[in-house]
Amino acid sequence: MTGIVGYGAHIPSYRIKVEEIAKVWGDDPKSISKGLVVNQKSVPGPDEDTITISVEAARRALQRAEIDPQDIGAIYVGSESHPYAVKPTATIVADAIRASPNLTAADLEFACKAGTAGIQAAVGLVKSGMIKYGLAIGADTSQGAPGDALEYTASAGGAAYIIGEDNTIADIEHTCSFTTDTPDFYRREGQAYPSHGGRFTGQPAYFKHVLGAANRMLEETGTTAKDYDYAVFHQPNGKFYIRVARKLGFTEDQYKQGLLTPNIGNTYSGATPLGLASILDIAKPGDKIFAVSYGSGAGSDAFKITVNDRIEEVRNNAKTLEEIQSKITYVDYATYAKFKGKIKMN
């Protein structure tokens, strides 16, 4: 069965606390942390971007997959913060991991679900027999305007998945999607920061689509929340994540391992892939995982995944998320603003 052959993740080591941002804008940090269920977020260093995050994650995925990168037939990088408007991130990743030029590669965009869209595309190509392995990455160095609510959550990170049919560590048993034209969040070409619909981003956007894809998955597979060991969802903040998990009948024991936002913020295209990676870091053979992404604009992709025996053989070939986050450095707002290019000089 087609599934995950290897996975890898990367999160920058810099962090900024909610209190530090709130101090600059005169906001109440306790109210913000409680409302968003976010305490701090990751910050990309001056030498980090979507490309470097993608490369690190891809290399770790290869370490676990134990395959020749020359056998990868497709590379997709999903992000809304590609460094170049015209120059693919995917080709740079391909060169960095020493993949063959005999492949198809593309940068994907669908707000925060571009990474899972890449996984679906790779699954389709592998199942069709067109390629042996596909590499799908979801990564971002997300943006939030100074003083905007997004500034408390917009962060950086990503995860990579190698999809194939042989020696899988987890089978992707089913996938489905739910998509509509919903203008909840957008950024035009040339704009530094996105615009969003405030409360409109909740019920008619995030919840409608995540629940739409999730309920479709449960119906098509004939399963309920009780049939899964773990669940992970897109996490623009901790509040939405917990609410949608509970609406679907999942317990804290099922959803807490995939909830990373309180300590790293919203990694956008990396959010659901990173949450899934966190689950794979501890999952046992036979465990069943329910995963649903979300991207503004708007749509959700859902996956039913079952973990295989091989995961215990290769899990320690690369750093786990716990190890990646073991060494962090806190920065003040001035350093954060400098790293993120928020200070513009004429």
Swiss-Prot record:
Name one process (GO BP) from the record.
farnesyl diphosphate biosynthetic process, mevalonate pathway
Q: Has keyword Transferase?
A: yes
- Catalytic activity field: acetoacetyl-CoA + acetyl-CoA + H2O = (3S)-3-hydroxy-3-methylglutaryl-CoA + CoA + H(+)
Matching InterPro entries, A to Z? ACP_syn_III_C, HMG_CoA_Synthase, Thiolase-like
Residues binding (3S)-3-hydroxy-3-methylglutaryl-CoA are D28, C112, T153, T201, H234, R243, N266, S296
- Top-rank EC class of the record's enzyme: transferase
List the active site.
Answer: E80 (proton donor/acceptor), C112 (acyl-thioester intermediate), H234 (proton donor/acceptor)
An MF annotation (GO) of this entry: acetyl-CoA C-acetyltransferase activity
Q: Which UniProt keywords apply?
A: Acyltransferase, Isoprene biosynthesis, Transferase
Where, in this chain's numbering, is CoA bound?
Answer: R199, K239
- EC number(s)? 2.3.3.10
Pathway(s) served: Metabolic intermediate biosynthesis; (R)-mevalonate biosynthesis; (R)-mevalonate from acetyl-CoA: step 2/3
Family label = Belongs to the thiolase-like superfamily. Archaeal HMG-CoA synthase family.
Q: Which HAMAP family match?
A: HMG_CoA_synth_arch
Database matches in NCBIfam families: HMG_CoA_syn_Arc (TIGR00748), PRK04262.1 (NF003274)
Assembly mode: Interacts with acetoacetyl-CoA thiolase that catalyzes the precedent step in the pathway and with a DUF35 protein. The acetoacetyl-CoA thiolase/HMG-CoA synthase complex channels the intermediate via a fused CoA-binding site, which allows for efficient coupling of the endergonic thiolase reaction with the exergonic HMGCS reaction.
**Do you know which PANTHER family this protein is assigned to?**
3-HYDROXY-3-METHYLGLUTARYL COENZYME A SYNTHASE, HYDROXYMETHYLGLUTARYL-COA SYNTHASE
The free-text function statement in the UniProt record for this protein reads: Catalyzes the condensation of acetyl-CoA with acetoacetyl-CoA to form 3-hydroxy-3-methylglutaryl-CoA (HMG-CoA). Functions in the mevalonate (MVA) pathway leading to isopentenyl diphosphate (IPP), a key precursor for the biosynthesis of isoprenoid compounds that are building blocks of archaeal membrane lipids.
What is the name of this protein?
Answer: Hydroxymethylglutaryl-CoA synthase
Organism field: Methanosphaera stadtmanae (strain ATCC 43021 / DSM 3091 / JCM 11832 / MCB-3)
